[in-house]
UniProtKB/Swiss-Prot annotation:
HAMAP family: GatB. Belongs to the GatB/GatE family. GatB subfamily. SMART domains: GatB_Yqey. Transmembrane segments: none annotated. Its EC number is 6.3.5.-. One of its GO terms (molecular function) is glutaminyl-tRNA synthase (glutamine-hydrolyzing) activity. Pfam families: GatB_N (PF02934), GatB_Yqey (PF02637). This is Aspartyl/glutamyl-tRNA(Asn/Gln) amidotransferase subunit B.
Amino acid sequence: MTQYETVIGLEVHVQLNTKSKMFCRCSTDYTSAEPNTHVCPVCLGMPGVLPTINKQAVEYTIMSGLALGCDIASFSKFDRKNYNYPDLMKGYQISQYDQPLCGKGFMDINIDGAIRRIGITRIHLEEDVAKLHHESDINGQPYSLLDINRSSIPLMEIVSEPDMRTPEEARQYLMKLRTIMRYLGVSTANMEDGSFRCDANISIRPEGSPELGAKVEVKNMNSFKAVFSALEYEEVRQRKMADEGKKISQETRGWQDDKCQTVSQRSKEFAHDYRYFPEPDLPPLHISCDWIEAIRAKLPELPEVRKERFIQGYWLSEYDASLLTASRELADYFEAVLSEADFQNIPQDKGIKEVANWVVGPVSSIMNTAGADINAFTLKVSPASLCRLLVLVSAGKVNAATAKAVLEDMYSTGQNAETIIEKKGLSQISDSSELVSIAKKVLADNPKAVAEYNEGKTQVIGFLVGQMMKQSKGRANPNIAMELLKKALEEG
């Protein structure tokens, strides 16, 4: 049986985070606005109007190209892409065809410890289309409504080379690309609200063959999971067809998430079907070296570089560094806590590790439970506030378990740690004389555990410490509790 290789390339559409649209001054805030309120004659496609280029969108595209190692064009232009669809207000889309802003680039992804370099073919700038809302009337007859607020939102298309060989590589590529876009601040890059959209081109070929097979474009994927599942399904479908001697058609297929399958939508278009020609109402762009270097100077530290710095400079594991740098804001928060910290009483590497554990542990857990991001968390728990809580833990004022509960209260109330601890009486009990009586009661209440300890099952001490924590309502110093229990057990 013939062995096949899967070939995948991705076209990622990224809505740019500008205040105004690509070719007019209308607001880009289309998600929270009433339908068809952020419109004007330009984005409505009225005859006789002239578009103007959004400079910020051009800069964001160049910045993205620099972050992905792309060649930046010194000359670029816009073109008309002609096709007929209800969401296209002018009857054509202003896009870029043969002279995009950014040329060849690349992005490295990590697959099971091996680095795979995925080529970037180009990055071009265009305008988004309006949004169709499909509804049904009282008789069940379908109809569609059109919201033109989204029309002409700046849209950047990042086209990869067909360098991915598995659905997992495609997913990893998308996840890393989204992280980079967010680090740059050029887009919110949320798949769920459509600001980060992906079309996938997938084909198969016999292993070792240099020729590409018939390309199938897959659309309607609105999550990383959907991209993975759609490509996995399509990979199996195409291989089955090839094994059965059936011809694979070049077509566009849509992913049906509820049925976990792709369905044919139309035959795949070729470039000449769109009848591209230069946009006559917009001047070409001349991009100087000085402008490019000025944009390069604005580039933030990118996630891969920051992760390596965290590993080398903060002695963190690759796992912890990856979690902390997955979000620029989370990494900023971590470093802000470190800047507030005083590691005079403990080794610096141990202190840094403790801060990292709290940020990737309790802090992230609270955010996930609340459905909040780090910006919302910071409004309630500043880096200085978290640092102060960790100082209280280090000084033995509260134990770690109690501190986690205090942190939850800090987030829900906005109060500082000291206020919450005092109000709820949560200060850790470190006075041996106070803990001795609790230890004696625990031993008296658990004769079976005492007998097991005396028989050499020393791990039972953990259970007894837990009972002391329960008796003290979480306030006992666990280290002192363990010492007292061991002493009492050894003395018989």
